Amino acid sequence: SIILGEGNWDEGSTALFKNVYNEFPWYSEGVNGFVDVKDVARLMIMLMESDVSNERFIISAENISYQQLFEKIAAAFHKRPPHKKITPFLAGLAWRVERLKYRFSGKKPLVTRETATTALRESKYCNQKILNAFPEFSFTSIDETIKRVAASMQQKLNKP
């Protein structure tokens, strides 16, 4: 799962928000699990305070496509959503070009081999085990997370 939350605009999953804010035109139809950083923190505390030990859990709120994610982020920023579907060929070309740019400029690549591959893959995660362990817990919706994170970033950018 990809953890979504406030953070450095240029790193990690928060860079997805920056790309959409800047109206990056490309999207993929890959699917991944997404979860709010606050849910991860709450569940970590709940696990530490419980009798649960020697267990592994998948912490994921929702499985959605990158296209859906980007459309939701764009709506939160009142920006145009990505509108060009990336193909495996273009994704492969993109990470290679980014790697060349990095070698010559030292600037961190926007797309890596791993991110290109992940963006095209359909990875779905089941959160049932953690919900069985903590039936009182409910995940924050990805819509709510996106609205909160976008509002926070909008405020940092000092734009309405």
Residue ranges of each PLM-predicted region?
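NAD(P)-dependent short-chain dehydrogenase/reductase
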Residues: 1-34
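C-terminal helical cap and adjacent loop that interface with cofactors, partners, or active-site loops
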Residues: 121-127, 135-136, 143-153
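Short aromatic/basic micro-patch
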Residues: 34, 63, 124-125
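Substrate-positioning beta->alpha
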Residues: 11-12, 28-48, 55
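Mid/C-terminal beta-alpha module of Rossmann-like enzyme folds, strongest
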Residues: 43-110, 141-142, 147-160
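A hydrophobic C-terminal alpha-helical subdomain
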Residues: 27-28, 39, 88-134
